[in-house]
Amino acid sequence: MDKKVLFEALNTELAKKNIDLEIICVGGFVLEYYNLRGTQDVDAFYQEDAKIISIIEKVGNDFGVNAPEELWLNNSVANMNRIPSRSICEKAYSYSNLTVFVPPLSYILGMKLESGRDRDRQDAGDIIKLVKIRSIKDVTNRLKEYGFQPDLSMILEVFEIAYGMEWLAEYMTEHPDELR
């Protein structure tokens, strides 16, 4: 389902209660936003309270998109991840009572590498390929700027996913100092 429709409905419900909400989306929704793949739910960072949970639940019920154990918009990522700085995020949608931000794909890459799950490693490879990242050193430095502690073996693995083993072997031959 088009998330923009859900965000518009969420804004309408927030406006009825005179509540303003800012969210920073991460995970699958950001991949969907950049046309990489779809997702069912929206993981986001936001200030949660009972009123906001109730509004999110209502919108999800109205559109039939809540999962049995999880609302369509949830901030469970806040338990395991650091929030991206708003200064690196772009405004994806802006309504009267709702503003939706997304971090750059390079930040999502860091989150995917940190998780280490199979699906996330594949997503990380897809991000590298989409953004046409060609430097392991640049990725490592950027992730460190964001506060991640990148694992070189994981970075090498996702570059292999993105470009193949031949490309990676050639890169390592041409840039031996980057891997020390």
Features from the language model and the residues they span:
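Compositionally biased terminal segments of proteins
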Residues: 1-180
